[in-house]
Regions:
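Bacterial N-terminal signal peptides
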Residues: 5-16
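Beta-propeller-forming repeat regions
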Residues: 20-245
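N-terminal secretory signal peptides that target proteins for export/translocation
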Residues: 1-3
Length: 245
């Protein structure tokens, strides 16, 4: 039976949340489009004001106990993203939600949410109208957990950064590496190109150079992100095709 859960204002839950083991996020989407920011990185004139979740509060039970929850941002924030991403970052078998959240004065950050609100996040970039483009998830440091890859300021600085979620002493995102010279988005495009592939057991990020003329691959080697030029790039669609080993 579907029961409607509470509508939650995010300003009340910006502190780190502890996710109950019995709860599972089964669906996530953005809602409440807003024109209060209008950065328009995807060519649109609106971003999102809320994160909508469907949460099973009795995961593993014979019958699901589904609740709809809305995590609503303060008026000074928007979600500046295409779609929320459900992924298990801490290896507990339950997914977290990974999103791009923007403070209108400080730019974007990569945020991780649970059923009741924010778990942790990277720092904001630090300047208005500065954005980051998620690249994907992979086990870059071979510890058995999925890490997060994104390109910070893909239209300007073009810096790939990789983070992993640590749960002790409290949840936080630890940076594993960064490298400049790779991007995955062009201003106005509705798609984020390329992503993470795993070939021969090794996670690597596929993207473009700053001129969109060369295909680039980034791997974590010896604790450092290493960038390689792997050939000419004539179309952004090549980056998506390259995700197939």
């Amino acid at each position: 039976m579907m029961r409607l859960g509470p509508i939650v204002a995010l300003g009340a839950v910006l502190a780190s949340a502890t996710v109950a083991q019995a709860e599972r996020i089964v669906e996530a989407s953005y809602g409440e489009p807003t024109s209060r920011y209008q950065h328009g990185v995807f060519g649109e004139t609106s971003e999102w004001g809320a994160l909508k979740l469907v949460v099973d509060r009795c995961a593993g039970c014979a019958s699901p106990d589904l609740h709809r929850i809305v995590l609503r941002l303060p008026e000074t924030h928007v979600f500046e993203d295409i779609v929320p991403r459900l992924v298990d970052l801490d290896g507990d078998g339950e997914p977290e939600v990974v999103v791009v959240e923007t403070d209108m004065a400080q730019g974007a950050r990569l945020s991780v949410y649970g059923p009741t609100g924010l778990i942790t996040a990277t720092p904001y970039i630090g300047q208005t109208r500065r954005w980051l483009a998620p690249a994907g998830f992979g086990d870059f440091n071979d510890d058995g957990l999925l890490d997060i890859a994104y390109v910070e300021t893909p239209h300007l600085g073009k810096v790939l950064r990789i983070f992993t979620l640590r749960t002790t002493p409290s949840p936080h995102l630890e940076e594993l590496g960064r490298v400049a010279g790779i991007t995955n988005h062009r201003i106005g495009d509705s798609n984020i190109w390329g992503g993470v592939r795993v070939c021969q057991g090794r996670a690597e990020v596929i993207g473009a150079d700053g001129n969109w003329s060369r295909m680039m691959v980034a791997r974590l080697q010896g604790g450092e992100l290493v960038l390689s030029d792997v050939g000419p790039l004539s179309s952004p669609a090549q980056l998506d095709a390259a995700l197939r080993c």
